Amino acid sequence: MSTLIPPPSKKQKKEAQLPREVAIIPKDLPNVSIKFQALDTGDNVGGALRVPGAISEKQLEELLNQLNGTSDDPVPYTFSCTIQGKKASDPVKTIDITDNLYSSLIKPGYNSTEDQITLLYTPRAVFKVKPVTRSSSAIAGHGSTILCSAFAPHTSSRMVTGAGDNTARIWDCDTQTPMHTLKGHYNWVLCVSWSPDGEVIATGSMDNTIRLWDPKSGQCLGDALRGHSKWITSLSWEPIHLVKPGSKPRLASSSKDGTIKIWDTVSRVCQYTMSGHTNSVSCVKWGGQGLLYSGSHDRTVRVWDINSQGRCINILKSHAHWVNHLSLSTDYALRIGAFDHTGKKPSTPEEAQKKALENYEKICKKNGNSEEMMVTASDDYTMFLWNPLKSTKPIARMTGHQKLVNHVAFSPDGRYIVSASFDNSIKLWDGRDGKFISTFRGHVASVYQVAWSSDCRLLVSCSKDTTLKVWDVRTRKLSVDLPGHKDEVYTVDWSVDGKRVCSGGKDKMVRLWTH
């Protein structure tokens, strides 16, 4: 069913007034001198230009496209400016142009109207994702609630789902039919994950085991991986660029039993068991610099060094309740590995490693530093932004949600963070400093998950209210309402090539959405 937006509360009305106060621009604001410089190469475009002091981000984008001769097929850009502190020892700050030049640089005092401002630009993406607008199919097959879903890292033609009927299923999204039913688990399939080379699917179950599958044949690759004493809560693959030559990516699993295990997927042996958490581990992520991050119901996040046999090197303590989820600023690069939006496959393992490392470093560079940032979401209604390689203290405490935060995700370029909460709202935050940007309202029940489009301009959410909604990050508004499911929607994913969105939930139907 289509949902009606509820009337705004007093708090929402107050929040809505804040952006208006920021947007007041002096009438006598003079023109300023700017120049465009490519962030990656340092090349200047067009020399010095005089522009209005209140020029908006969109107008800057139009101007740059004119200078580059791409007005007919405009490229979306992000703009930032580096600010040196008053003392030589002060760190250099990177300020994003998020609204207009005046509110981002001049009003806060970073620049005056007499300065020449160098704007560093970088393309948001090399392609444009269209918002999905319709359900292309509703496919039956699962006999119980669908709990998890994931597109392949290299194509939108293949997708896997896990359900409460003890099976996972691989779907052919081109013909919109089921390909293989993955039978072997004896209880609910709680998590599914594609290896970053697209050659193996891992499933984790409430039967305490993990199984590996061949996505082409649907056959189980050997026996189940056994060792956990309680159910599997999440899975994470070793990034391609860290895999030793001649080896296959290893797999990390987290469990309700409070441990994390590292599995050799060829010999099927558990290499390390990492103990230390005193309660269920809700989420595990394998980072791009040889570290593993885990969030737990013991209210802590732990950082583990895989190169030192899984030794715990940091414990991050700030949350006052369960840690439900965590996301890395490099998640997208780690997911796609050596692929890109075209799905072109490298010809050799060496080429794959090189391309995967390029993808990873490109994301780090876009984010303004070479380190992975991490955001954690909790039952305490808050999130924390961390630089786990530098400090055990958070960069920012992110507050605003009125109920538990269930899901959190960095945008593919690491510039934004989006959070989904049981307070029916989605919030957008700055990925560098954790500052609040906007609230997306429209769902009338708990929001379970969010997924980004690869070009960072759109996101899709799924909710208890039976709908999916597509949001425009630039306008901060609802783009498309997607009714269709007959009950709660628990899982959503957006394919890397941007062509499709998949969803599943309590009505047992897999839905594919396209434009």
Swiss-Prot record:
Q: Where are the transmembrane segments?
A: none
Q: Record's GO cellular component, any one?
A: nucleolus
Q: Where in the cell is it found?
A: Nucleus, Nucleolus
Q: Which organism is it from?
A: Saccharomyces cerevisiae (strain ATCC 204508 / S288c)
Positions of the UniProt region annotated as Interaction with MDN1: 20-128
Task: Name which cysteines form disulfide bonds.
Answer: none
Mapped WD repeat ranges: 141-181, 184-223, 227-273, 276-314, 352-396, 400-439, 442-481, 484-515
Q: Region Ubiquitin-like (UBL) domain: start and end of each range?
A: 29-125
Name the InterPro entries for this protein: G-protein_beta_WD-40_rep (IPR020472), NLE (IPR012972), WD40/YVTN_repeat-like_dom_sf (IPR015943), WD40_repeat_CS (IPR019775), WD40_repeat_dom_sf (IPR036322), WD40_rpt (IPR001680)
This chain belongs to the protein called Ribosome assembly protein 4
What the record says about family reads: Belongs to the NLE1/RSA4 family.
Keyword Repeat attributed: yes
- What is the annotated quaternary arrangement, including any partners? Associates with the pre-60S ribosomal particle. Interacts (via WD repeats) with uL18 (RPL5). Interacts (via UBL domain) with MDN1 (via VWFA/MIDAS domain). Interacts (via WD repeats) with NSA2.
